[in-house]
């Protein structure tokens, strides 16, 4: 079974070895055909705590690491220009 992957933006890194990643998905409205944007937040494991707010990351599904954490940061796609 292939591993699920999602691309998102880090919105919080205040926890130890954990980041909050915002993932946007676009889909057409079934009646009006307008493109809708659905946003979902995932807790992802960041072993080295190297992600910063605004970084674009690739997250992969993994085994449950805690009550809400089932994703891990696979790689950082692009770094943010924000200095934190």
From Swiss-Prot:
Keywords: Chloroplast, Plastid, Ribonucleoprotein, Ribosomal protein, RNA-binding, rRNA-binding. One of its GO terms (biological process) is translation. The keyword Membrane does not apply. It is found in: Plastid, Chloroplast. InterPro entries: NA-bd_OB-fold, Ribosomal_uS17, Ribosomal_uS17_bact/chlr, Ribosomal_uS17_CS. GO terms for molecular function: rRNA binding; structural constituent of ribosome. Pfam families: Ribosomal_S17. Its main location: plastid. Gene3D superfamilies: Nucleic acid-binding proteins (2.40.50.140). GO terms for cellular component: chloroplast; mitochondrion; ribonucleoprotein complex; ribosome. One of the primary rRNA binding proteins, it binds specifically to the 5'-end of 16S ribosomal RNA. NCBIfam families: PRK05610.1, uS17_bact. Belongs to the universal ribosomal protein uS17 family. Part of the 30S ribosomal subunit. This is Small ribosomal subunit protein uS17c.
């Amino acid at each position: 079974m292939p591993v699920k992957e999602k691309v998102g933006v880090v919105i919080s890194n205040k926890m130890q070895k954990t980041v909050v990643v915002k993932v946007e998905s676009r889909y057409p409205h079934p009646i009006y055909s307008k493109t809708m944007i659905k946003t979902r937040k995932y807790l992802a494991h960041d072993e080295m705590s190297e992600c910063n707010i605004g970084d674009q990351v690739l997250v992969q599904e993994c085994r449950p690491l805690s009550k809400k954490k089932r994703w891990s940061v696979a790689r950082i796609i692009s770094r943010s220009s924000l200095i934190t």
